Amino acid sequence: KCTGCWAAEYGNKLNLTFDEIDSIIMQGKELGVYFYIYTGGEPLVRKKDLIALCRKHHDCQFLTFTNGTLIDEEFADQMLDVKNLVPAISVEGFEEATDGRRGNGTYEKAVRAMGYLKERKLPFGISCCYTSQNLDSIASDAFFDQMIDWGAYFAWYFHYMPVGNDAAPELLPTPEQREY
């Protein structure tokens, strides 16, 4: 569980079954919706279901927010096969910041996942939750250059919101930082 993350507050009681997700996608397609985003916790704990949904709905595009720790060579090959699943790998900056918020070894696993994806020429991006402590780092040219070198095509930036039992108000960016 990541420091200050709201997703863990819900536990797994709100997880949808494969059939429920499939039904939502079918209903969405009837309405002209062909792009779907998986969020967490960690969506890749259900890799098998995600790949099956990608295969079944090959006319749709899927994006998943992930810490990247479950992307291995086999899963990267499956992504290459389906061609319609794009991960946004969560990093909080460089190693110290990412591991500090997401757990020791997370950064190394995320970088390894980026390597598997880049080797296969699979599109992926990064997802960053900016805080009072990491904003300077994740907005730096050095950070962008590193992520581009590792193959990232896009970046999502989310403003930290202190929500839930583990909220850390000191991580909230200052008004001056938010203007940056």
For each feature predicted by the language model, list its residue ranges.
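Radical SAM/AdoMet-radical enzyme domain recognition
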Residues: F18-Y38, R46-H159
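Active-site donor-binding loop signature of nucleotide-sugar glycosyltransferases
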Residues: A7, H159-Y160
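A C-terminal junction/extension of Radical SAM enzymes
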Residues: Y160-Y180
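Canonical Radical SAM [4Fe-4S] cluster-binding loop centered on the CxxxCxxC motif
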Residues: K1-D19
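Short, intrinsically disordered, charge-balanced linker/junction segments flanking boundaries
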Residues: K1, I148-Y153, P173-Y180
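A short acidic, helix-capping loop that chelates divalent metal ions and anchors anionic groups
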Residues: G11, E95-R101, V163-P169
